[in-house]
């Protein structure tokens, strides 16, 4: 449902976002900058060409750090000689990247003189200005029950009899690792039952703790005992955002790289030992910023490595294609729906949105204690419903008698299956270019084959019921007023479902 993103340079330059920063050097690599994001001053992400080998990449990274050191020494000398110069401190090389062999590069904080030499180096395909990212959420203080779990397990709109009933397979998520790339996770929370683990902290100097709550909330929706979709899955916290809920694109890319590496290591070990207890990996990223080709490529590379990835569409009531990682075509991009089966007023939309899931007034785990909960809203809350579903469906495979140690289903196949079985046309306020698809978990079945064979489902809309009842009235003609009153009561009820 998303357009193909080519790795060639021409599409990068032709795309309206990010924009190209002009260069006076004909052969210099372009510097990309997003028009709808806040840039981090003098910070860059450098991406190598496809033909650059790991050895050449390592040599280049040594070269750029040496170049940075030399330039900084010259600046220090000018300062001692009292020549006027811009008194800035530059940190040099920050992260190096190698995401499953699909994308290599590095990030850093560099002086203009350094970055100009980097641009003219033959290894470099493009440079992207680092930018801020932030969690997609809109805090709400209302303490409602987790209706979102009930909604993804029922086909039609929730009623008084179904709004708090979640139908699920008891072992849903078992054997699956889910990387929650966010603000961290309160791994001591009782709802995780010891299945939450600290994976990696990316921001320099930050602590291994969720000081914000956003990541903990997402993790609870993925895998909590009470609040989670996949109640037996393991959660690994990958902290890329600081306690204020913001961070940098370069840190997020590094977090994606770490998750991909951890997944590949686990998968190789499982296949080597024939360990059927490990079914595979999923990931959730409920964050975003302006359009970043590098982040989109990083997510796509992680998917190619085998991670089933869910990302939030964004909360700007705008086209998701203008945001990253929402525009990463190999991930599952998730918009937010409401209890009334509407598109949430804040949810992004468009052809880059693959599916919708509950995202308004979602109750889940929180920080502050082992028992804390909170209700918040956003596509950040919708995405972990789908990440949980990815883990849930992965855990149903392979079958017990399978020769495979790890689920053989690819991320592309599972994404296709999830969309195929989803509930169609269930939501209102869906723009014409946006798929009207609501996520579904199979209604509690543990037989993946049977779930897929059911196929999709066309939701029963209140408007259709009203039309049927109107036709019924016309046929009745001259019935008594009391009979007509009863029918009109039915019409009223149909509109208020």
UniProtKB/Swiss-Prot annotation:
<keyword id="KW-0645">Protease</keyword>
<dbReference type="InterPro" id="IPR000209">
    <property type="entry name" value="Peptidase_S8/S53_dom"/>
</dbReference>
<keyword id="KW-0378">Hydrolase</keyword>
<dbReference type="InterPro" id="IPR036852">
    <property type="entry name" value="Peptidase_S8/S53_dom_sf"/>
</dbReference>
<feature type="domain" description="Inhibitor I9">
    <location>
        <begin position="43"/>
        <end position="134"/>
    </location>
</feature>
<feature type="active site" description="Charge relay system">
    <location>
        <position position="214"/>
    </location>
</feature>
<feature type="active site" description="Charge relay system">
    <location>
        <position position="182"/>
    </location>
</feature>
<dbReference type="InterPro" id="IPR010259">
    <property type="entry name" value="S8pro/Inhibitor_I9"/>
</dbReference>
<dbReference type="GO" id="GO:0006508">
    <property type="term" value="P:proteolysis"/>
</dbReference>
<keyword id="KW-0732">Signal</keyword>
<dbReference type="InterPro" id="IPR050131">
    <property type="entry name" value="Peptidase_S8_subtilisin-like"/>
</dbReference>
<dbReference type="InterPro" id="IPR023828">
    <property type="entry name" value="Peptidase_S8_Ser-AS"/>
</dbReference>
<keyword id="KW-0325">Glycoprotein</keyword>
<dbReference type="Pfam" id="PF05922">
    <property type="entry name" value="Inhibitor_I9"/>
</dbReference>
<feature type="signal peptide">
    <location>
        <begin position="1"/>
        <end position="16"/>
    </location>
</feature>
<keyword id="KW-0843">Virulence</keyword>
<dbReference type="Pfam" id="PF00082">
    <property type="entry name" value="Peptidase_S8"/>
</dbReference>
<dbReference type="GO" id="GO:0004252">
    <property type="term" value="F:serine-type endopeptidase activity"/>
</dbReference>
<feature type="glycosylation site" description="N-linked (GlcNAc...) asparagine">
    <location>
        <position position="284"/>
    </location>
</feature>
<comment type="similarity">
    <text>Belongs to the peptidase S8 family.</text>
</comment>
<keyword id="KW-0964">Secreted</keyword>
<feature type="active site" description="Charge relay system">
    <location>
        <position position="380"/>
    </location>
</feature>
<dbReference type="InterPro" id="IPR037045">
    <property type="entry name" value="S8pro/Inhibitor_I9_sf"/>
</dbReference>
<keyword id="KW-0865">Zymogen</keyword>
<feature type="domain" description="Peptidase S8">
    <location>
        <begin position="146"/>
        <end position="452"/>
    </location>
</feature>
<protein>
    <recommendedName>
        <fullName>Subtilisin-like protease CPC735_031240</fullName>
        <ecNumber>3.4.21.-</ecNumber>
    </recommendedName>
</protein>
<dbReference type="InterPro" id="IPR015500">
    <property type="entry name" value="Peptidase_S8_subtilisin-rel"/>
</dbReference>
<dbReference type="GO" id="GO:0005576">
    <property type="term" value="C:extracellular region"/>
</dbReference>
<keyword id="KW-0720">Serine protease</keyword>
<feature type="glycosylation site" description="N-linked (GlcNAc...) asparagine">
    <location>
        <position position="447"/>
    </location>
</feature>
<feature type="glycosylation site" description="N-linked (GlcNAc...) asparagine">
    <location>
        <position position="244"/>
    </location>
</feature>
<feature type="propeptide">
    <location>
        <begin position="17"/>
        <end position="136"/>
    </location>
</feature>
<comment type="function">
    <text>Secreted subtilisin-like serine protease with keratinolytic activity that contributes to pathogenicity.</text>
</comment>
<dbReference type="InterPro" id="IPR022398">
    <property type="entry name" value="Peptidase_S8_His-AS"/>
</dbReference>
<dbReference type="InterPro" id="IPR034193">
    <property type="entry name" value="PCSK9_ProteinaseK-like"/>
</dbReference>
